[in-house]
Amino acid sequence: MKKTSLFENALIWFGAGVSIAEILTGTYLAPLGLKNGILAILVGHVIGCILLFLAGVIGGKMRLSAMDSTKMSFGQKGCLLFAVLNVLQLVGWTAIMIYDGALAADGIMHTGAWIWCLIIGILILVWIGVGITNLGKINTVAMVALFVLTLMLSKFIFFDGNSAVAGTEAMTFGAGVELAIAMPLSWLPLISDYTREAEEPVKASLVSSIVYGIVSCWMYLIGLGAALFTGEYDIAQIMLKAGLGIAGLLIIVFSTVTTTFLDAYSAGISNESIVPKWNGKSVAMIVTVVGTFAAIVYPMDYITDFLFLIGSVFA
């Protein structure tokens, strides 16, 4: 079976890091001010990414999926419980990410959020169909585009914006660190689904953690800077104020696709621990369809706390 290279793993986790969810989380750190906000981001990500690296090594060296690796500590029945919870939370996160991405895209181009749900869902299906070991070329193009576009966004926020406003002391430094740790920890139940496919799993775990950590910090900083320098907390308005327009739309859509793809794909892999006969890729496609449908018909604003509750089991 074809294995993924270090470069391919770096691309996968670059895509995971470029996320509107991470930008929005960065805006929440604005009460700390610029200096303390940056420090909280760095401290939180160092802690979170060390744990992410260790999780990747455990599953990667043993060529086990994230859920199968829990058998070592919790046995077969424990593994089933974790797998069911993981599939449940990943279906939920797939729906939420599609929903949030569609709302942000519709904030730039008002064609109806449901249309953007369909577009994002179809693109995720394309990513899944190509497969994790064959994504090299398509991921390279997508990541180069996202890299250039986010550089443009960073230039607007940090060099063309106003002076930073002072923090309000409404948030403790510890709370800020917790927010920064949250994103790396959210990938703990997923990372070995990808490092197990790597040619060099330990190096792939290290590269994945470092790339994700750097890019995630960058996204947090964009969010923090947007809140402090532009006074905006809405991702669509941030893009419009930056004068990005269609470019901003591409950032929103493709960052949502490259992040949510990992949720849907890992839901399929986790399901193999529950029903081994079911093909992981097929289940991932079903999860994407279900998530897209849910994002269209159900307001996703009120289930985030429930998903965080499930996710806390893995942290």
What feature does the model see in each segment?
Residues 1-36, 134, 172-177, 189, ...:
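Membrane-interface "cap" regions at the ends of multi-pass membrane proteins
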Residues 2-4, 130-140, 166, 186-214, ...:
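Hydrophobic, small-residue-rich membrane helices and short re-entrant helix-turn-helix hairpins
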Residues 3-11, 76-88, 168-177, 240-255, ...:
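Select transmembrane alpha-helical segments in multipass membrane proteins
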Residues 12-16, 82-87, 108-130, 143-154, ...:
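Transmembrane alpha-helical segments of multi-pass small-molecule transport proteins
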Residues 20-32, 57-59, 95-104, 126-134, ...:
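Transmembrane helix-loop junctions in multi-pass membrane proteins
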Residues 26-39, 103-117, 133-141, 235-247, ...:
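Transmembrane helix-loop boundary segments of multi-pass membrane transporters
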Residues 27-57, 78-80, 212:
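Extracellular loop-to-transmembrane helix junctions
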Residues 79-110, 256-273, 313:
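Hydrophobic transmembrane alpha-helices that form the core helical bundles
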